[in-house]
C-alpha cells in the first residue's frame, strides 16, 4: 500500500453504540436485498475524516465501472475528452455490446458515463496507454494503480478495471472522492468541472446525491466468472445546505440476479441515506 489509512474519528467510534448510529446500521441491513450481502458502507467528510463505517471497508476489490470517475478526469485532463458532448464516438463491430441498445449507438462523454459504456472507456485507455494511465492512477492514490490486466494476457487497456489487476478499497474510494471534490487532485480545474458536470444525480431526504455505479463478477479458481457473486458498487458525494459528504457502498451477491449489483447498491443507498446522514456528527 502506498500510504497508511487515516484512522477512524475517535469521538465517532465512541458514539457507535448510540441509538441513531445503531438505527442506521439496522436500516443498512434491512434495505439491502436478501440476495446481496452488504460488504461496506462508508461516509467521510471531503477532508478525509471517516464519519460512518460499517463492514469490511479496507479490503481492495475491483472498481468495475466506478473507475469511470478517475478515467473521466484523465480523459478531460489529457484532452481526449473535450466537453459533455465531444467527442462523439461510434460503436464498432467487436466492441462490447452486452449493455444493450445504448452501447451500440454513438456515445459522447455524458452518455458514456450515464450508460456505463465499456467500449468508450477502452477508446480512452487505448489512446492514453498503460504507462500514462498508471501514472495518473498512482498520482490519484487510486487503489493499487495496477493497470496491467490479467497475468500474461496483455489486456490491461481492455479490462484492468473489470475483475482484473486494478483494485481499490471502499475507504480508498472515499479518500479519492474527497480529493476530487476539494480539487486536490493533480489535474486541470476544467477536468474536475467537466467530470462533475456529467455525473448523474438523484435526490434523497433533501440531499442531492451524485455518483457512479459499478458491477463486476469475481473470478473462480479456474479463471471463469462467478456470476452468482457479483460485486455491486455505488460511490459518490451528497450535498445539502452547504455540506458535502463522500460515500462508498459495496455489496456482494449470494445468488445470481437479473438486475445489476451496482443499480441495486445505488437504490439501497438512496433508501437509507437520510437515516445515515442524520446520524452523523456535524
Language-model regions, residue ranges each:
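Structured C-terminal helix/loop/strand segments within mature extracytoplasmic catalytic/sensor domains
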Residues: 57-60, 126-129, 181-282
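Active-site SXXK
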Residues: 61-86, 112, 173, 247
Amino acid at each position: 500500500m502506498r500510504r497508511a489509512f487515516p484512522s477512524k474519528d475517535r469521538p465517532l467510534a465512541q458514539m457507535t453504540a448510540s441509538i441513531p448510529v445503531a438505527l442506521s446500521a439496522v436500516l443498512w441491513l434491512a434495505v439491502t436485498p436478501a440476495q446481496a450481502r452488504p460488504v461496506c458502507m462508508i461516509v467521510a467528510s471531503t477532508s478525509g475524516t471517516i464519519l460512518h463505517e460499517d463492514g469490511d471497508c479496507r479490503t481492495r476489490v475491483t472498481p468495475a465501472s466506478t473507475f469511470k470517475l478517475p478515467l473521466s478526469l484523465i480523459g478531460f485532463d489529457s484532452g481526449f475528452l473535450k466537453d459533455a458532448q465531444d467527442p462523439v464516438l461510434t460503436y464498432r463491430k467487436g466492441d462490447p455490446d452486452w449493455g444493450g441498445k445504448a452501447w451500440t449507438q454513438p456515445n459522447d462523454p455524458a452518455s458514456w458515463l450515464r450508460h456505463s459504456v465499456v467500449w468508450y472507456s477502452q477508446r480512452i485507455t487505448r489512446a492514453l496507454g498503460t504507462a500514462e494511465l498508471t501514472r495518473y492512477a498512482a498520482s490519484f492514490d487510486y487503489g493499487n494503480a495496477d493497470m496491467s490486466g490479467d497475468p500474461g494476457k496483455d489486456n490491461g487497456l481492455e479490462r484492468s478495471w473489470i475483475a482484473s489487476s486494478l483494485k481499490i478499497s471502499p475507504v480508498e474510494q472515499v479518500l479519492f472522492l474527497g480529493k476530487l471534490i476539494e480539487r486536490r487532485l493533480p489535474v486541470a480545474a476544467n477536468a474536475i468541472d467537466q467530470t462533475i458536470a456529467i455525473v448523474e444525480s438523484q435526490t434523497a431526504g433533501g440531499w442531492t446525491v451524485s455518483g457512479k455505479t459499478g458491477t463486476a463478477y469475481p473470478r473462480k479458481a479456474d479463471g471463469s466468472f462467478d456470476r452468482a457473486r457479483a460485486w455491486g458498487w455505488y460511490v459518490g458525494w451528497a450535498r445539502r445546505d452547504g455540506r458535502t459528504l463522500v460515500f462508498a457502498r459495496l455489496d456482494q451477491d449470494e445468488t445470481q440476479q437479473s438486475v445489476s449489483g451496482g443499480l441495486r447498491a445505488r437504490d439501497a443507498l438512496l433508501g437509507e441515506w437520510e437515516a445515515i446522514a442524520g446520524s452523523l456528527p456535524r
